[in-house]
Regions:
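Active-site beta->alpha loop and helix N-cap motifs at the rims of alpha/beta catalytic domains
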Residues: 2-11, 15-144
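Catalytic alpha/beta core domains of metabolic enzymes, predominantly
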Residues: 128-129, 142-248
Length: 296
């Protein structure tokens, strides 16, 4: 059995921006401290929610270094270093390891339309090049590429391939992965509305967008499940559904950055080509935040 990088709720943290569009490292530091104070179990930096596609190489590596330094060993730091260019992913992954990241989050190659054999070769090459755990990231709605259970079972034989973040939204697919891989691969939910279903299939937690605005709550969904308080965990999961729906009423991370700004954080805007949500989406999110209790 592979020891999980974390158990519980990891925040897929936003990258706050200044008004001139540069990364607001001071605010990132404040958010990191607040997340840890509210029981976040790990921090994922430079993921989808962190706007990794529009960060420069310098910003990407600096965000990882800054987060490692700020977290200071209090929680694991997982660096998003995936790419559709294997050579580049290896470079970025080795840099993140050298800068102190505890693990890597590696999205499947996108746009290239590689085969399952290509995925095996891609991930094996990255895992061979580093000495820290690799969490694979399956999100076919964004990448057009789906990691099959058979491919994951083969990849799980590699000692550095520790887990998969499963964001297909297909709970049957998750069940097939769990059956195919057993204890050789940890599974994390990549969907906030499917935390409890995935835990019921043996999952170890969630890499969460919701946790940006409700870190303690998201942690508690997992903690209560692992403590045997499954009815309470389920109740909390269901209560959060309207808020989760609102957080994904537009392309992530547009709504969650709006919500963070609304809560008083200096999250800033998303970088182009992402633009602000419509007034209707903002109103939906405002209502959901009020009903959930985030706003008075």
């Amino acid at each position: 059995m592979k020891r999980p990088v974390f158990t519980g709720a990891a925040v897929a943290i936003i990258t706050p921006m200044n008004t001139d569009g540069s990364v607001n490292y001071d605010e990132l530091g404040r958010i990191i401290d607040d997340q840890i104070a509210h029981s976040t179990d790990a921090i994922v930096i430079c993921g989808t929610t962190g706007e990794s596609p529009t960060l420069t190489d310098e910003e990407h590596t600096e965000c990882i270094r800054y987060t490692v330094k700020k977290a200071a060993g209090r929680v694991p730091v997982i660096a998003g270093t995936g790419s559709n260019d294997t050579k580049y992913a290896i470079w970025l992954s080795k840099q993140a390891e050298a800068d102190g990241a505890d693990a890597l989050l590696l999205v499947t190659p996108y746009y290239n339309k590689t085969s399952q054999a290509g995925l095996l070769a891609h991930y094996t090459a990255i895992a061979d090049a580093v000495h820290i755990p690799c969490i694979l990231y399956n999100v076919p709605s964004r990448t057009g590429c789906n990691l099959t259970p058979a491919t994951l079972a083969e990849l799980a034989k590699h000692p550095n391939i520790n887990a998969v973040k499963e964001a297909s939204g297909n709970i049957s697919h998750v069940a097939e992965i769990a059956a195919a891989c057993g204890d050789s691969l940890n599974i994390y939910s990549g969907n906030d509305d499917q935390i409890v279903p995935l835990l019921a299939l043996g999952g170890k937690g969630v890499i969460s967008v919701l946790s940006n605005v409700a870190p303690q709550y998201t942690h508690d969904i997992c903690a209560k499940w692992f403590a045997g308080e499954t009815a309470e965990s389920l109740s909390m999961q269901l209560k959060a559904v309207p808020l989760i729906k609102a957080l994904f009423a537009d392309v992530n991370p547009i709504p969650v950055k709006w919500a963070m700004n609304r809560l008083g954080w200096n999250a800033g805007d998303c970088r182009l080509p992402l633009v602000a949500s419509s007034a209707a989406v903002q109103a939906q999110l405002e209502t959901a935040m009020q009903e959930f209790g985030l706003l008075k």
